[in-house]
Amino acid sequence: MEIANEKKIAGLVQFLRKGRTMTGRFRLPMLEEQAYEYLLAAYIMEVQLRYRRFIYNGFVEEQLKQVANCLTANTAKFGIVLCGGCGNGKTTMLKALQNLVRRLEILKPNLSPNAGHSSDNYYSFTIVNAMQIVQIRKTDYNKFCKLAEADILGIDDIGTEPAEVQDYGNFIYPIKELLAMLYDAQLFTVFTTNLEPKEIRQQYGDRIADRLNEMMTKVVYRNPTYRTENAQMADSQG
């Protein structure tokens, strides 16, 4: 179905847009293949920092390819969910992403290459644990709100926190609150969880689950844990 007076409507859209800005989608400034190589190197380094031997396998290859695509594709999505069982590399990937963004020193949108070397001109990447978010919400609401202003926010272990928390007689829902704020701000978010997609809906409700579907690309970790006794002796990467 076509819009009547399409040219006129387009002009009205431009008129109404004056003074409004679209939130830029964070992307790595490189092609997908190069992003894969950088991610692989960053991932290997995180494994080595844990005194483990990196083992390249099909699971890791597919996970890295999916994340590289998320970070370079021209899409409306502005986040990644790393979901799957315990100990299979999700937090390792999150930390690898954080280090990569920091090392690349990526300029924020609308800044020229001559903008200077102030840290405020480059994307930062903050990681916080879900349980820490609950505590921050209870003790420092201003700091809690600042989390929703981070250039890129990584939330580790969503689903391990209590669904509701009592604070001075009132029930609060810190993760649901923060996810709603991040959705409104449209800032890039990465989180890890052991929850299945249907469990995310059960824990946080239809409203948040639907918003997460709009915001984020799911990368499902299907490999078993790297934390078994044998893996700890040889190939652990979790």
For the regions a protein language model found, what residue spans apply to each?
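Conserved glycine(s) of the Walker
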Residues: 87-90
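Hydrophobic positions on the alpha1 helix immediately C-terminal to the Walker A/P-loop
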Residues: 93, 97
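Walker A/P-loop NTP-binding motif
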Residues: 99-102
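Hydrophobic anchor at the beta1->P-loop junction of P-loop NTPases
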Residues: 82
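Walker A (P-loop) ATP-phosphate-binding motif of ABC ATPase nucleotide-binding domains
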Residues: 79
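A short, basic N-terminal segment
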Residues: 1-76, 229-238
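Conserved nucleotide-sensing/catalytic segment adjacent to the nucleotide-binding pocket
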Residues: 112-183
